[in-house]
């Protein structure tokens, strides 16, 4: 039996200093998509993008719950994660 793939919750720091939170199976590949302008609309035109945080989750639903929780945090709480 193979292990379930690991989902990741990640934070990117955009060139304008804002933080973007998302989920992915392959964070490095997703970062390249963002950098190529093929990621979320929010990150387009806000480069350069830097990966500043990632957290492993056991399932997609768990990753989505954690992403939602992080997005609801104040900026100071997000900064404490870093």
Feature names for model-found ranges:
Residues 1-71, 75-82:
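GIY-YIG nuclease catalytic motif and its immediate N-terminal context
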């Amino acid at each position: 039996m193979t292990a379930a793939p690991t989902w990741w919750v990640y934070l990117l720091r955009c060139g304008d200093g804002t933080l973007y939170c998302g989920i992915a199976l392959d964070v490095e590949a997703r970062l390249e998509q963002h950098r190529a302008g093929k990621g979320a609309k929010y990150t387009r035109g806000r480069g350069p993008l830097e990966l500043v945080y990632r957290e492993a989750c056991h399932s997609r639903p768990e990753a989505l719950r954690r992403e939602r929780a992080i997005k609801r945090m104040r900026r100071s709480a997000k900064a404490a994660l870093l």
